[in-house]
Amino acid sequence: MNNILEVKNLSKKYNDFELKNVSFELPKGMILGFIGENGAGKTTTIKSILNIVNDYTGEINVFGMNNRKNDKAIKEDIGIVLDDMFFPEILNPKDINSIMKDIYVNWDSKLYFKYLKEFSLPQNNQIKTFSKGMRKKLEIATALSHHPKLLILDEPTSGLDPVARNEVIDIFQDFIQNEECSILLSSHITTDLEHIADYIVFINDGEILLSKTRDELLERYGIVKCTEKEFKKINGNDFIRYRKSKYEYEVLVENKKEFNKKYNINTIDKITLEDLMVMMIKGVR
């Protein structure tokens, strides 16, 4: 088993939204960055993987097991941080430790308190006194403290200052040094994913638009800036999307080197994941 997670033709219909045949794989030892606008389908996909949303069609396998048939065994080995997951505010971090000891077979109190110390989280203070960033750190500490093989993280660095964010990213990178472990990381902070993700899956309006390695996206793709005259000479099969402004055209291309050889247009910008998202969503085919 080379893949720790496999999602095949996942579909789910709501009154005003539909997840349409979502498929992707997460190999062992890798970080997959899951990107898209709010409402694009990221959270529905994650909650389907976790069997929180279970009235879907398609197949999801985690650790080589069907997630519906093996829910309890699978969750024993998953560390979870959800954007809408909250601990009761009257509890303190020590209370969380007592609760988690009864939930996870492999709960490691020593490791948990080590993370609390690293994150400067007071053990005896009620969670209601914590800032948003402190609460997020507590969720991350909890997710890591039962020796999971897979981390599923929805906006894990939201609310963290740059120093704390870098600290958390370092912890995630340490986590996958064990080649049996992987991370599915959904985030709006695309610069984080540019540094740590091995794969990028881009979802929009319930459909997967791109699923590539990070290096392929950032090194091969590019945005060409050209005049209207130059744009009219470009074959429609040679670009993915374009945007027109008052003074120029911006054209998203899949292979900037090959494009430049063919058209000899030298104004090609290095792409970021944010650029890619904007062009894929706002650009014209």
Predicted feature locations:
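C-terminal coupling/interaction segments
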Residues: 239-285
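ABC transporter nucleotide-binding domain
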Residues: 169-253
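Exposed alpha-helical structural elements
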Residues: 111-114, 230, 272, 276
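Non-catalytic surface loops within mature trypsin-like serine protease
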Residues: 28, 228, 255-257
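Short loop/turn segments at beta->alpha junctions
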Residues: 92, 213, 269-272
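Short glycine/proline-enriched coil/turn segments at helix->beta-strand junctions
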Residues: 13-16, 29, 147, 235-239, ...
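ABC transporter nucleotide-binding domains
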Residues: 2-7, 12-184, 188-191, 195-196, ...
